[in-house]
C-alpha cells in the first residue's frame, strides 16, 4: 500500500482488460505510475512486457503487480525476473506484488484504500467492492459503460460476450439494453478494445 504513494514505482494490473474496465488501483497524485496492458487474456502479457515502450517505463523503477487473488502476479513477476536475468534492457529496482491480490487488499482496507470501482470475480459473486464504500460512490468510480447505449454501468450481467470471433471477452450490457442484446444485437456487441481496434 505504501509503495503506491512512491513516484519511483510503477504498478501493473495483470488482469484482463474486461476486469480492469470495472475497477482498478488508482495511485495517489505524485505516486506510482499505473500501467494497464489492455489484455484480452494473460497469454498476451509476454508480448506486452517485451515491447520496447513497456521496458522503457519499467527501467529503474520498483515494479508492483496485482491481480484478483495473486496467482497471475506470481507468473507475471516470474516472467519479468526471467527477462531481467536474460537482458540488460529491462533492469528494475525490484519486483513486488500485492500479496493475496485485490481480494485481500479489500479485506485489509474495507474503505477501499487506493482501489476504485469493483473487483471482477470468476465465481458466482461476479463482483466485489470495498465493504465500507457507498454503492453510489462505487458506481461513479468505475467509468465503464454499457456496450450498447454507452450509459454508465458496471455490472457484467447476463454473460454477454464480444461478437468478434477472435475476442469473445465479456461485455457490459445494462438492464435497459439486455433484451435487445439477447436478440437482434447479439452479433454486434463489441468490447472496448475491439471498438478501439486494439
Question: What residues fall within each predicted segment?
Answer:
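Rhodanese-like catalytic fold shared by cysteine-dependent sulfurtransferases
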Residues: 3-9, 16-64, 71-198
Amino acid at each position: 500500500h505504501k509503495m503506491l504513494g512512491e513516484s519511483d514505482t510503477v504498478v501493473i494490473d495483470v488482469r484482463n482488460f474486461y476486469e480492469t474496465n470495472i475497477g482498478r488501483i488508482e495511485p495517489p497524485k505524485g505516486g506510482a505510475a499505473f500501467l494497464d496492458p489492455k489484455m484480452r487474456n494473460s497469454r498476451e502479457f509476454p508480448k506486452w512486457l517485451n515491447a520496447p515502450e513497456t521496458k522503457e517505463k519499467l527501467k529503474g523503477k520498483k515494479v508492483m503487480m496485482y491481480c484478483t487473488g495473486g496467482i497471475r502476479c506470481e507468473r507475471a513477476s516470474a516472467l519479468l525476473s526471467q527477462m531481467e536475468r536474460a537482458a540488460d534492457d529491462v533492469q528494475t529496482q525490484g519486483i513486488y506484488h500485492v500479496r493475496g491480490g485485490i481480494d485481500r487488499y479489500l479485506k485489509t482496507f474495507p474503505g477501499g484504500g487506493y482501489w476504485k470501482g469493483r473487483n471482477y470475480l470468476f465465481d458466482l459473486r461476479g463482483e466485489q467492492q470495498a465493504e465500507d464504500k457507498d454503492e453510489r460512490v462505487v458506481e461513479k468510480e468505475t467509468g465503464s459503460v454499457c456496450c450498447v447505449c454507452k450509459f454508465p454501468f458496471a455490472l457484467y450481467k447476463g454473460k454477454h460476450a464480444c461478437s468478434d470471433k477472435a475476442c469473445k471477452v465479456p461485455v457490459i450490457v445494462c438492464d435497459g439494453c439486455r433484451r435487445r442484446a439477447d436478440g437482434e444485437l447479439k452479433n454486434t456487441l463489441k468490447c472496448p478494445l475491439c471498438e478501439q481496434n486494439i
